Amino acid sequence: MRDLRSDLKELYRALSQTPATEGGRTVMFMSARSGEGVSSVATAFALLAAEQARKPVWLIDLDLKRNHLFNTFAVGPFADAFGGVGPPYSASLKTQPFFSVEPELPEATQGLGLFTAHRVGETRLMVTQFDASRLKAGHGIRIKT
């Protein structure tokens, strides 16, 4: 993964000038195929926003089973450069989850601690992690639409 922050400064400047809604801004980066660099772009943009923003910036990886973005900050060059990831915080924000586990987990465990956010070093960046280790064989995760 490459650090593309310098390439994204103009995009950040343009987006930061648009009015924010009550809860802030949401920016989504998507690609048609794997390997197109969307993880590098999203990570660099989140780091740039975290450097400039007054509030925390959340980097949410929708590839829940792989946790690629979390792992990027947990070990390796980005972990070394930014200080690794801190302890988990609930990422539920007291709302219904945007994902479902099928077949459903027992009610006592559904959603509890499955999706967490971790502060990256001393930055304002929070990166998410889905605890796929709690799923059993045959369980799947779906993003709700």
Annotate each language-model stretch with its function:
Residues 41:
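Hydrophobic positions on the alpha1 helix immediately C-terminal to the Walker A/P-loop
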Residues 46, 50-51:
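Gly/Ala-rich phosphate-binding loop of Rossmann-like dinucleotide-binding domains
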Residues 2-5, 9, 13, 20, ...:
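P-loop/Walker-type NTP enzyme "switch/lid" segment
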